[in-house]
A protein has these predicted regions:
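N-terminal targeting signals for export/organelle localization
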Residues: 1-34
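Structural microenvironment flanking redox-active thiols in thiol-disulfide oxidoreductases
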Residues: 60-115, 119-125
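Thiol-/selenol-based redox modules, centered on thioredoxin-like
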Residues: 140-218
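Short active-site neighborhood of thiol/selenol oxidoreductases, capturing the structured segment around
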Residues: 39-67, 81-84
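Solvent-exposed coil/turn segments that connect beta secondary-structure elements
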Residues: 54-55, 88-89, 119-120, 149-151
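Surface-exposed short loop/turn segments
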Residues: 120-140
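Extracytoplasmic
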Residues: 44, 78-81, 139-142
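Sec/Tat-exported extracytoplasmic proteins
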Residues: 71-75, 126-129, 133, 187, ...
């Protein structure tokens, strides 16, 4: 791992090498959801921040800006990282306006994805996760979730804070401080986890190649 990357990943405030799995094997994004740019968006093989902003965009716009500033601007450059927001159809123009504002604050928005669908389809998909929080009357929630490349929900479980057992499956976008601290740390740990696994696999491949070369020489 390059020294710059090592220093970046080492800045997480808690030193866990792995982010706990809260629940496993969640469903892929339904094909009926259409992205803003009509590109194909999938959860599989991506680290995903998943959110459901709802149809009251004017009221929750600040939450999206919090996400952009505190999370996306830090991690959007990783090719296997993405932000996926699912909201009711009919809000495309408002999201386009928000993306125009984002472009003044961020250099590259290619890993921001907004998907649109019918409210009942969104609620059906949301319920498959069995999250503790429910969607509101606008088919939205201020909470976002971290999914790994295998579509497992990640968070905090069993870590001690002031003598208490911590459980966290989501992050509140209303709180810029929570995104900046807890969520940023957790995304960083998950990215580091995959980088360490990649490095370990590369060492195995190099060792295997070396053995094969020695056998060929004989």
């Amino acid at each position: 791992m390059p020294i710059v990357a090592y220093m970046f990943f080492a800045t997480a405030s808690h030193n866990s090498l792995f982010l706990p799995v809260i629940s496993k094997n969640h469903a892929e994004l339904p094909s009926e959801f259409v992205s803003l740019n009509e590109e194909k968006v999938v959860l599989d093989k991506n680290i995903t921040v998943l959110g459901f902003p709802g149809s009251n965009i004017d009221e929750v716009k600040a939450n999206l800006f919090n996400l952009n500033q505190k999370i996306y601007n830090k991690y959007g450059g990783f090719k296997d990282f993405q932000m996926v927001m699912i909201l009711p159809d009919g809000n495309q123009d408002k999201i386009k306006a928000i993306m125009l504002e984002f472009r003044r604050l961020s250099n590259d928005l290619k890993n921001w994805h907004f998907l649109f669908g019918k409210p009942e389809a969104i609620e059906t998909y949301y319920n498959t996760f069995k999250f503790k929080n429910k969607l509101d009357a606008f088919t939205g929630s201020p909470f976002v979730y971290i999914l790994d490349k295998e579509k497992n929900l990640r968070g905090r479980k069993g870590q001690k804070i002031k003598g208490k057992v911590e459980y966290r499956e989501c992050y509140n976008t209303i709180s810029a401080a929570e995104l900046h601290n807890e969520m940023s740390d957790d995304v960083k740990i998950l990215l580091r986890e995959y980088r360490l696994a990649l490095k370990k696999n590369k060492r195995k491949d190099d060792f295997r190649d070396k053995i094969e070369q020695e056998v060929i020489k004989k």
